[in-house]
Design a protein with these regions (language model features):
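Bacterial Sec-dependent N-terminal signal peptides
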Residues: 1-13
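N-terminal accessory beta-strand-rich subdomains and adjacent acidic, glycine-rich linkers
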Residues: 14-243
Length: 243
Protein backbone atom coordinates (compact mmCIF):
# COMPACT_ATOMS: atom_id res chain seq x y z
CA UNK A 1 0.00 0.00 0.00
CA UNK A 2 1.18 3.52 -0.77
CA UNK A 3 0.41 6.71 1.13
CA UNK A 4 0.20 9.74 -1.12
CA UNK A 5 -0.07 13.21 0.43
CA UNK A 6 -0.08 16.23 -1.85
CA UNK A 7 0.63 19.79 -0.76
CA UNK A 8 -0.12 23.17 -2.27
CA UNK A 9 2.76 25.61 -2.58
CA UNK A 10 3.46 27.60 0.57
CA UNK A 11 2.32 30.70 -1.26
CA UNK A 12 0.48 33.50 0.47
CA UNK A 13 -3.21 32.99 1.08
CA UNK A 14 -5.28 36.19 1.14
CA UNK A 15 -8.66 36.86 2.68
CA UNK A 16 -10.64 40.10 2.40
CA UNK A 17 -13.48 41.36 4.58
CA UNK A 18 -16.90 41.70 2.90
CA UNK A 19 -16.45 45.48 2.52
CA UNK A 20 -12.85 45.11 1.29
CA UNK A 21 -11.26 47.24 4.01
CA UNK A 22 -9.54 44.47 5.99
CA UNK A 23 -7.05 42.16 4.29
CA UNK A 24 -5.51 39.11 5.96
CA UNK A 25 -2.41 37.44 4.54
CA UNK A 26 -1.41 33.96 5.67
CA UNK A 27 1.66 31.89 4.87
CA UNK A 28 3.97 29.26 6.35
CA UNK A 29 7.43 30.77 6.93
CA UNK A 30 10.80 29.11 6.31
CA UNK A 31 10.72 27.47 9.77
CA UNK A 32 7.32 25.99 8.98
CA UNK A 33 5.52 28.31 11.40
CA UNK A 34 2.00 29.54 10.54
CA UNK A 35 2.22 33.31 10.02
CA UNK A 36 -0.37 36.01 9.39
CA UNK A 37 -0.64 39.77 9.07
CA UNK A 38 -3.54 42.22 8.80
CA UNK A 39 -4.09 45.55 7.08
CA UNK A 40 -6.97 48.05 7.28
CA UNK A 41 -7.56 50.38 4.33
CA UNK A 42 -4.02 49.67 3.18
CA UNK A 43 -2.37 50.41 6.55
CA UNK A 44 -0.68 47.68 8.57
CA UNK A 45 -2.55 46.82 11.78
CA UNK A 46 -0.81 43.56 12.72
CA UNK A 47 2.70 42.91 11.43
CA UNK A 48 3.71 39.34 10.50
CA UNK A 49 2.92 37.25 13.58
CA UNK A 50 3.31 33.53 14.19
CA UNK A 51 0.68 31.12 15.48
CA UNK A 52 0.98 27.83 17.31
CA UNK A 53 0.63 25.82 20.48
CA UNK A 54 2.99 24.02 22.83
CA UNK A 55 1.72 20.79 24.32
CA UNK A 56 2.54 19.41 27.74
CA UNK A 57 5.39 16.94 27.40
CA UNK A 58 4.44 13.35 28.04
CA UNK A 59 5.90 11.50 31.03
CA UNK A 60 8.86 9.49 29.72
CA UNK A 61 8.66 7.06 32.66
CA UNK A 62 5.33 5.66 31.49
CA UNK A 63 4.08 3.67 28.54
CA UNK A 64 1.49 4.92 26.08
CA UNK A 65 -1.94 3.44 25.41
CA UNK A 66 -0.40 0.83 23.12
CA UNK A 67 2.06 -0.16 25.90
CA UNK A 68 4.97 1.29 23.99
CA UNK A 69 7.88 2.61 26.05
CA UNK A 70 8.27 6.40 25.81
CA UNK A 71 11.88 6.99 26.84
CA UNK A 72 12.96 8.73 23.64
CA UNK A 73 13.26 12.29 24.98
CA UNK A 74 13.97 13.78 21.55
CA UNK A 75 10.74 12.34 20.23
CA UNK A 76 8.82 13.62 23.26
CA UNK A 77 10.21 17.13 22.66
CA UNK A 78 9.09 16.92 19.05
CA UNK A 79 5.59 15.77 20.01
CA UNK A 80 5.09 18.84 22.22
CA UNK A 81 5.69 21.10 19.21
CA UNK A 82 2.60 22.45 17.47
CA UNK A 83 4.18 25.74 16.40
CA UNK A 84 6.57 25.00 13.51
CA UNK A 85 7.63 22.30 11.06
CA UNK A 86 4.33 22.58 9.17
CA UNK A 87 3.54 22.40 5.47
CA UNK A 88 0.45 23.92 3.90
CA UNK A 89 -1.68 20.98 2.79
CA UNK A 90 -4.83 22.81 1.69
CA UNK A 91 -6.69 26.11 1.94
CA UNK A 92 -10.45 26.54 1.70
CA UNK A 93 -12.53 29.74 1.59
CA UNK A 94 -16.22 30.27 2.29
CA UNK A 95 -18.61 33.18 2.86
CA UNK A 96 -21.42 33.53 5.38
CA UNK A 97 -24.20 36.08 5.86
CA UNK A 98 -27.12 35.93 8.30
CA UNK A 99 -29.19 38.24 10.49
CA UNK A 100 -30.25 37.22 13.98
CA UNK A 101 -32.24 38.83 16.79
CA UNK A 102 -30.73 39.04 20.29
CA UNK A 103 -32.87 38.52 23.39
CA UNK A 104 -31.81 41.90 24.73
CA UNK A 105 -29.38 44.69 23.88
CA UNK A 106 -29.11 47.92 21.94
CA UNK A 107 -29.68 46.34 18.53
CA UNK A 108 -32.91 44.73 17.34
CA UNK A 109 -31.08 42.76 14.66
CA UNK A 110 -27.42 41.84 14.28
CA UNK A 111 -25.84 40.96 10.96
CA UNK A 112 -23.30 38.14 11.08
CA UNK A 113 -21.36 38.48 7.83
CA UNK A 114 -17.84 37.26 7.18
CA UNK A 115 -15.45 35.64 4.75
CA UNK A 116 -13.60 32.57 6.00
CA UNK A 117 -10.25 30.94 5.29
CA UNK A 118 -9.45 27.49 6.68
CA UNK A 119 -5.83 26.41 6.28
CA UNK A 120 -5.02 22.72 6.75
CA UNK A 121 -1.47 22.29 8.04
CA UNK A 122 0.47 19.01 8.06
CA UNK A 123 3.45 18.39 10.34
CA UNK A 124 5.56 15.60 8.76
CA UNK A 125 7.85 15.07 11.76
CA UNK A 126 4.86 14.03 13.88
CA UNK A 127 2.52 12.83 11.12
CA UNK A 128 -0.37 15.02 12.24
CA UNK A 129 -2.55 17.86 11.03
CA UNK A 130 -4.22 20.92 12.50
CA UNK A 131 -6.58 23.49 11.03
CA UNK A 132 -6.35 27.24 11.59
CA UNK A 133 -9.67 28.88 10.73
CA UNK A 134 -9.85 32.64 10.13
CA UNK A 135 -13.04 34.67 9.92
CA UNK A 136 -12.78 38.21 8.62
CA UNK A 137 -15.67 40.56 9.38
CA UNK A 138 -16.06 44.19 8.35
CA UNK A 139 -15.05 45.23 11.87
CA UNK A 140 -12.55 42.60 12.90
CA UNK A 141 -10.70 39.30 12.63
CA UNK A 142 -11.25 36.07 14.53
CA UNK A 143 -9.27 32.83 14.39
CA UNK A 144 -9.18 29.48 16.15
CA UNK A 145 -7.25 26.22 16.18
CA UNK A 146 -9.00 22.97 15.28
CA UNK A 147 -7.74 19.43 15.80
CA UNK A 148 -9.04 16.82 13.34
CA UNK A 149 -9.51 13.35 14.80
CA UNK A 150 -6.32 11.36 14.19
CA UNK A 151 -4.26 8.67 15.88
CA UNK A 152 -1.15 10.84 16.24
CA UNK A 153 -3.05 13.60 18.08
CA UNK A 154 -5.54 11.68 20.14
CA UNK A 155 -5.05 12.92 23.70
CA UNK A 156 -3.08 16.02 24.72
CA UNK A 157 -2.84 18.89 27.19
CA UNK A 158 -2.04 22.41 25.96
CA UNK A 159 0.83 23.92 27.97
CA UNK A 160 1.21 27.28 26.21
CA UNK A 161 -0.44 29.21 23.42
CA UNK A 162 2.04 31.00 21.16
CA UNK A 163 -0.39 33.17 19.17
CA UNK A 164 1.27 36.51 18.45
CA UNK A 165 -0.25 39.93 17.81
CA UNK A 166 2.62 42.13 16.62
CA UNK A 167 1.20 45.64 16.72
CA UNK A 168 2.34 48.04 14.03
CA UNK A 169 2.96 50.90 16.45
CA UNK A 170 3.50 51.92 20.07
CA UNK A 171 -0.22 52.45 20.63
CA UNK A 172 -2.00 53.98 23.59
CA UNK A 173 -3.32 51.06 25.66
CA UNK A 174 -6.12 50.91 28.23
CA UNK A 175 -5.14 48.02 30.49
CA UNK A 176 -5.29 46.22 33.81
CA UNK A 177 -2.88 43.53 35.04
CA UNK A 178 -3.60 39.98 33.94
CA UNK A 179 -5.10 38.07 36.86
CA UNK A 180 -6.46 34.58 37.49
CA UNK A 181 -9.03 35.63 40.09
CA UNK A 182 -10.34 39.15 39.61
CA UNK A 183 -10.97 42.07 37.27
CA UNK A 184 -10.99 44.57 40.15
CA UNK A 185 -8.19 46.91 39.13
CA UNK A 186 -8.09 50.56 38.15
CA UNK A 187 -7.35 50.97 34.46
CA UNK A 188 -3.99 52.38 33.46
CA UNK A 189 -3.62 54.38 30.24
CA UNK A 190 -0.14 54.25 28.74
CA UNK A 191 1.85 53.40 25.65
CA UNK A 192 2.40 49.70 25.02
CA UNK A 193 6.12 50.13 25.68
CA UNK A 194 5.40 51.55 29.14
CA UNK A 195 3.35 48.62 30.48
CA UNK A 196 6.34 46.72 31.88
CA UNK A 197 7.55 49.71 33.90
CA UNK A 198 4.08 50.57 35.23
CA UNK A 199 2.94 47.06 36.14
CA UNK A 200 4.15 47.09 39.75
CA UNK A 201 2.29 50.27 40.66
CA UNK A 202 -0.86 49.04 38.88
CA UNK A 203 -1.10 46.15 41.37
CA UNK A 204 -2.69 47.21 44.66
CA UNK A 205 -2.36 45.42 48.03
CA UNK A 206 -5.50 43.31 47.76
CA UNK A 207 -5.73 39.68 48.84
CA UNK A 208 -8.06 38.86 45.94
CA UNK A 209 -5.48 39.84 43.33
CA UNK A 210 -3.28 37.14 41.80
CA UNK A 211 -1.36 38.57 38.81
CA UNK A 212 -0.11 35.83 36.51
CA UNK A 213 2.81 37.73 34.96
CA UNK A 214 4.95 40.84 35.55
CA UNK A 215 4.14 41.93 31.99
CA UNK A 216 0.81 40.25 31.13
CA UNK A 217 -2.42 42.24 30.83
CA UNK A 218 -6.04 41.17 30.94
CA UNK A 219 -8.30 40.91 27.92
CA UNK A 220 -10.14 42.74 26.59
CA UNK A 221 -7.18 44.98 25.76
CA UNK A 222 -8.19 48.18 23.99
CA UNK A 223 -5.65 50.26 22.06
CA UNK A 224 -5.77 53.48 20.07
CA UNK A 225 -3.37 54.21 17.23
CA UNK A 226 -1.94 57.66 16.60
CA UNK A 227 -4.26 58.07 13.61
CA UNK A 228 -7.38 57.24 15.65
CA UNK A 229 -8.00 53.56 14.91
CA UNK A 230 -9.27 51.58 17.90
CA UNK A 231 -8.05 47.97 18.26
CA UNK A 232 -9.45 45.47 20.74
CA UNK A 233 -7.98 42.05 21.58
CA UNK A 234 -10.31 39.56 23.27
CA UNK A 235 -11.45 35.94 23.40
CA UNK A 236 -14.63 34.56 21.85
CA UNK A 237 -16.69 31.35 21.80
CA UNK A 238 -15.57 30.17 25.24
CA UNK A 239 -17.97 27.24 25.03
CA UNK A 240 -17.95 24.92 28.06
CA UNK A 241 -15.10 26.94 29.60
CA UNK A 242 -14.96 26.88 33.39
CA UNK A 243 -15.88 30.50 33.99
Amino acid sequence: AFLCISFIANAQQKLTSPDGNLVLTFQVNKEGAPTYDLTYKGKVVIKPSTLGLELKKEDNTRTDFDWVDRRDLTKLDSKSNLYNGFKLKDAQTTTFDETWQPVWGEEKEIRNQYNELAVILFQPMNDRSIVVRFRLFNDGLGFRYEFPQQKSLNYFVIKEEHSQFAMAGNHIAYWIPGDYDTQEYDYTISRLSEIRGLMQQAITPNSSQTPFSPTGVQTALMMKTDDGLYINLHEAALIDYSC
